Amino acid sequence: MGSKWQMEKHNDPYYKKAKKEDYRSRASYKLKQLDKKYKIIKEGDTVVDLGAAPGGWSQVALEKVGEEGIVVGVDLNRIKPFHEPNYYGIRGDFTKEIVQEKVMELTHGKAKVLMSDAAPSLTGVKDLDHLRSVDLVETVFKIAENILETEGNLVIKAFQHRSYTRRLP
C-alpha cells in the first residue's frame, strides 16, 4: 500500500469518524447501517464474525448483544483483544475444519448471526482476486448451513463481480 492510499485513507470521513469514536475500522459504520435497517443483531444473540480483523464488526456486535450474548471473531491475522468476557477471538483459517470445530464448540453449535467481511490476499489480478473472494463466500455459505439457526441472519460483504449470479447459491 503506497502513500497515495495512506493519504486517501486519512482523508476519508468514515476513517476519521472511526478514529474519533474509537472504532477499530470504518467498516463498523457499514454494519451499523445494515443493522439499523434490517435489525440483524439483537441483545442476547450469538454472533460469529468470519474475517474479523481488525475487529470493527465484532465491536459493533458486542455493543448489540450485551452481556448475555456471545461474539466469536475468527481471522488469519491477530485480532487485538477485546476486554469483554463474552468475546472469543480465534486466530486461524476459517476455511479449515479444525477452526470451524472450535467455533462450533464456543457457540454450542448454533449462532443467530453469521457475518463475514473476509477478503482474500490480493494479487492485483482482478478476475483471480474475484474468484478467491467467491471461494471464501462459498465457504461462509457452507458454514452457515451447519451453524446458523433457523430464522438466523447471514451478512456477507464481498467483491462485486459480474459472475456472482452464476456462482453463488
Mark where each language-model region is:
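Class I SAM-dependent methyltransferase Rossmann-like catalytic core
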Residues: 2-43
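Glycine-centered, small-residue-biased loops immediately flanking beta-strands
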Residues: 45, 69, 152
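Conserved SAM-binding loop of SAM-dependent methyltransferases across substrates and taxa
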Residues: 54-66
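Class I S-adenosylmethionine-dependent transferase superfamily signal
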Residues: 61, 103, 140-144
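S-adenosyl-L-methionine
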Residues: 74-121
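Mobile active-site "lid"/loop adjacent to the S-adenosyl-L-methionine
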Residues: 91-94, 109-155, 162-165
